[in-house]
Amino acid sequence: MCIRDSLDILINNAGTVYTGYMLDRSDEALENLSNVNFTSMIYTIRAFMPGMLEKNSGHIINISSASSMTGAPKLAVYAATKWAVAGLTESLRLEVQKMGKSGVRFSSIHPNFLKKGLFEGTKLNFLGQLLAPGVKSHDAVAKVIVNRAIKLGFHSPKVPWIMNQVVLLRALLPSSLLIKVSSLYGLYDMMDDYKGYEDGR
């Protein structure tokens, strides 16, 4: 049996980041960012989803980001790719329902920025960290994948769970007030001390 036909769980976790204003980045850099963060997921899903549909069983888990719930200065294209991941996941979930293949499940995971590694140095101010604290380790994300997505079947768990407040704020606040709140908790300045990729790749 081909591995494409026998896979039960696919976790799409490829990701990279370029920071800075969008117009300051090269076309090549932005294309690479889009390919790694989004387009690659389309190809892996197309490779393994047919086998899951055939047996009407399987779970595809796509790693998105907290930036899929709100924009972020100096992360415009990164955030856009993560919004795309969330939209792809939601749309495919509906597609398999229409196909009568509800045994194939889809989840998107939305972790806030990791304090170490790719987003080291990224931080909000004190108020912002209360509302949207950073993720301490990859293990915290892994536990959410296993416990909330795989075991409980959550469609789009946030990491940490308090990040659901961001979704609530977006739904309740008018745009003009949401901009002020974003400034108040330090969203505009969160990339000022970024150290994750100091070479600017």
What name fits each language-model region?
Residues 1-3:
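Short, small-residue-biased leader/transition segments that mark boundaries at the very start
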